[in-house]
C-alpha cells in the first residue's frame, strides 16, 4: 500500500510539471533579473515547489556564497588630455568609463562602466524599456561623428533594477546592466572606481560628466561635457527649496548657481578624486532635480556608497578592479 501511494504522488508531480502555462513576453513585461526570476518561479515552478515541500529544498550551491573578488586591473584612471571645465567639452575620452545608453537608436541616458561586464545607471533610465532595444556605447566622445574614437557598442543581456525604486520619490534610483559581451580595457575604455563604504563626499568638489543639455530647454550636447559642482551635506540639501522629506539619506545634492547637471545627464556619473588629481571614484548617479542650475534647487544624485552591498550581491558572476 505505501508503495502505491508513492507511485501516485510521483505521477502527480510529473503531471503538474508538464502542465502548459501561458507564455509571457519577458522583454515587454519585465525590467529586472529579479522580476524575471520571480516570474519563472511563478509560471514554471509549481511542481518543483510541491516536490520541495515534501522532500526538502536543495542546498545552495557553494559558488553562490562566494564574495565578489578583485580583478587584476586598475580603476578610475583618467586620460591626460588637456582639461576644460565649467560646462565646457572634456578632452577626448578623458573619462574612459563614461557610457551612453541608446534606446531604439536614440540617445537616452548616461551610465558608467564599473568592470568589463557591467555598467551602472539610474533605475528611472531603464523603466519600461525593452532590453532588446538598449545599446551601451563606450569610448565615445562626439555623438555626431561616426568612429571619432575607438568606441565599442554592446547589447544588454540583463537588467537589475533596485527592487525598491520609487517612481514618485526617485529613492533607490540605481540599476545595473550586464553587457552581452565583455569589453576589453584600453585607453578609451576603462572602469571607474566605486567609493569606499565610509566616504562622505560632502564639502568636496565633484565632477559631472555627460551629454546632457548645456542649458534648461536647450539641445543635447554633441560632445561629452563636464562641470564641477560643490557637494552639499544632507542638512544643506534639506535646507534648500526642496521639501526636506524629498531628500533621503540615499541621495546626494550638488550644484550651485549655473553649475549643475541637466536633462540628458540622467544615469551619468558624479565623480570625486580622493587619491590624487587623476584617479576618480563614482560617488553619485545623476537622478533628478528641478530645472537646470536654478537657484535653490541643486541637482540630486543617488548616493552610490549606500548601495555597495547591493552592487556586489548582483555582480557575483564577475569581479571588480582594485581601488
Positions of PLM-derived features:
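C-terminal subregion of chymotrypsin/trypsin-like serine protease catalytic domains
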Residues: 2-24, 114-119, 123, 226-232, ...
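Chymotrypsin/trypsin-fold serine protease catalytic domain
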Residues: 64-72, 77-79, 144-146, 152-154, ...
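Sequence contexts marking disulfide-bonded cysteines in secreted/extracellular proteins
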Residues: 70-76, 110, 124-126, 236-238, ...
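Conserved H-D interstitial segment of serine endopeptidase catalytic domains
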Residues: 77-81, 101-102, 119-122, 127-164, ...
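Extracellular regions of mammalian proteins, primarily the fibronectin type-III
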Residues: 94-98, 108-120, 132, 152-158, ...
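Acidic glycine-/aspartate-rich tracts in secreted/extracellular proteins
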Residues: 124-127, 140-144, 180-185, 212-215, ...
Amino acid at each position: 500500500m505505501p508503495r502505491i501511494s508513492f507511485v501516485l504522488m510521483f505521477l502527480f508531480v510529473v503531471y503538474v510539471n508538464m502542465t502548459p502555462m501561458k507564455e509571457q513576453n519577458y522583454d515587454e513585461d519585465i525590467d529586472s533579473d529579479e522580476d524575471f526570476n520571480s516570474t519563472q518561479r511563478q509560471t514554471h515552478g509549481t511542481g518543483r515547489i510541491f516536490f520541495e515541500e515534501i522532500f526538502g529544498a536543495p542546498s545552495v550551491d557553494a559558488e553562490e556564497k562566494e564574495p565578489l573578488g578583485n580583478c587584476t586591473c586598475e580603476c578610475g584612471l583618467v586620460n591626460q588630455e588637456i582639461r576644460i571645465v565649467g560646462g565646457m567639452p572634456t578632452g577626448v575620452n578623458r573619462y574612459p568609463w563614461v557610457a551612453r545608453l541608446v534606446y531604439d537608436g536614440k540617445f537616452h541616458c548616461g551610465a558608467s562602466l564599473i568592470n568589463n561586464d557591467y555598467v551602472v545607471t539610474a533605475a528611472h533610465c531603464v523603466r519600461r524599456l525593452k532590453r532588446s532595444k538598449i545599446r551601451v556605447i563606450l569610448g565615445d566622445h562626439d555623438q555626431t561623428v561616426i568612429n571619432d574614437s575607438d568606441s565599442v557598442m554592446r547589447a544588454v543581456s540583463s537588467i537589475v533594477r533596485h527592487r525598491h525604486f520609487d517612481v514618485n520619490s526617485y529613492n533607490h534610483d540605481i540599476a545595473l546592466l550586464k553587457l552581452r559581451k565583455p569589453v576589453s580595457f584600453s585607453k578609451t575604455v576603462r572602469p571607474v572606481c566605486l567609493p569606499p563604504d565610509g566616504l562622505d563626499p560632502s564639502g568636496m568638489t565633484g565632477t559631472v560628466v555627460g551629454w546632457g543639455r548645456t542649458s534648461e530647454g536647450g539641445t543635447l550636447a554633441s560632445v561629452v561635457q563636464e562641470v564641477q559642482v560643490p557637494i552639499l551635506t544632507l542638512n544643506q540639501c534639506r535646507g534648500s527649496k526642496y521639501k526636506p522629506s524629498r531628500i533621503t539619506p540615499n541621495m546626494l545634492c550638488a550644484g550651485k548657481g549655473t553649475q549643475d547637471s541637466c536633462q540628458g545627464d540622467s544615469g551619468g556619473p558624479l565623480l570625486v578624486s580622493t587619491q590624487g588629481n587623476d584617479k576618480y571614484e563614482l560617488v553619485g548617479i545623476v537622478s533628478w532635480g528641478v530645472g537646470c542650475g536654478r537657484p535653490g534647487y541643486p541637482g540630486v544624485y543617488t548616493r552610490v556608497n549606500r548601495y555597495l552591498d547591493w552592487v556586489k550581491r548582483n555582480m557575483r558572476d564577475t569581479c571588480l578592479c582594485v581601488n
